[in-house]
Amino acid sequence: MPYILISTQIRLETGPTMVGDEYSDPSIMNYLGARKITVLGNNFSEYHVDEPPRLVLDKLDKIGYRVVSMTGVGQTLVWCLHKESSNTL
């Protein structure tokens, strides 16, 4: 999976940070220490960590992910990260 989206709401400095959806790579989620949760009323699961986004971004940088874009939507901040694939067609 070459792309990852992470997001946080309201408090950038403290977390929690949403790091993946139910289809995310389990090995990356394990590396981040994420837990899979389903919020009451939602019909999908998400992976969350208690760490702030900066620490998550640092961890993803160590395994080769780079920020492609970042945006704010209301009180939510979202980062899109990409990892170059070693498979070339």
From Swiss-Prot:
Name of a matching Pfam family: GFRP
User: What is the protein's given name?
Assistant: GTP cyclohydrolase 1 feedback regulatory protein
Organism, per UniProt? Danio rerio (Zebrafish)
GO MF, one term, reads: GTP cyclohydrolase binding
Q: How does it assemble?
A: Homopentamer. Forms a complex with GCH1 where a GCH1 homodecamer is sandwiched by two GFRP homopentamers.
Subcellular localization, as worded in the UniProt entry? Nucleus; Nucleus membrane; Cytoplasm, Cytosol
Task: Provide the GO biological process annotations.
Answer: negative regulation of biosynthetic process
Biological role: Mediates tetrahydrobiopterin inhibition of GTP cyclohydrolase 1.
| The family this protein is said to belong to | Belongs to the GFRP family.
UniProtKB keywords: Cytoplasm, Membrane, Nucleus
InterPro entries, per the entry: GFRP_sf, GTP_CycHdrlase_I_reg
Q: What is the phylogenetic placement of the source species in the record?
A: Eukaryota, Metazoa, Chordata, Craniata, Vertebrata
Q: What are the annotated GO cellular component locations?
A: cytoplasm; cytosol; nuclear membrane; nucleus
| Tree of life domain | Eukaryota
